[in-house]
């Protein structure tokens, strides 16, 4: 069906910044283990957000990122090194089918809207997890390295401090 989002005035907006996995994964969430840490788990927690009077959630990165893109023996928990800006993080979905993450993310957004809660996405558009010239090729580097990234003399320019900088000037 048609999804319409709430329009709260800025003066009346109460934003709850959250990490989808972190907000729903802990045992204190009371969620079934199968949906804890997922978009579906967040749907189940909407009554709690409504009870708090929340009018908007700011979701920390929910686009696809590499959880192993971190120092040895660590994980990339926060997701600030995107692989693809247009694909929901698959590990946050309880539905592991090919369209599961997309379907579950869409259902979560619709459920939040239906309950009067706006959705704000925290995004990083200055770099990707592909790193520098020696980093992995996931997406943009393979499509058109010179088009997507700032390149000088064939090498990535690192204005972001993350190994590469997206060419947002074109």
What are these model-predicted stretches?
Residues 21-41, 47-170:
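Substrate-binding/active-site clefts of carbohydrate-active enzymes
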Residues 1-17, 25-34:
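The feature marks proteins involved in alpha-glucan
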């Amino acid at each position: 069906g048609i999804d319409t989002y709430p329009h709260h005035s800025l003066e009346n907006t109460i934003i709850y910044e959250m990490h989808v996995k972190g907000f729903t994964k802990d045992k204190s969430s009371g969620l079934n283990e199968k949906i804890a840490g997922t978009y579906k788990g967040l749907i189940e927690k909407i009554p709690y957000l409504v009870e708090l009077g929340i009018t908007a959630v700011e979701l920390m990165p929910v686009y696809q990122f590499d959880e192993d893109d971190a120092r040895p023996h660590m994980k990339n928990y926060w997701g600030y090194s995107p692989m693809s800006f247009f694909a929901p993080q698959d590990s946050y979905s309880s539905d592991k089918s090919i369209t599961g993450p997309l379907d579950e993310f869409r259902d979560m957004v619709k459920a939040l809207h239906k309950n009067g809660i706006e959705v704000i996405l925290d995004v990083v558009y200055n770099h990707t997890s592909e790193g520098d010239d020696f980093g992995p090729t996931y997406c943009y580097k393979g499509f058109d390295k010179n088009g997507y990234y700032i390149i000088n003399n064939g090498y990535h320019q690192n204005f972001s401090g993350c190994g590469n900088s997206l060419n947002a000037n074109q």
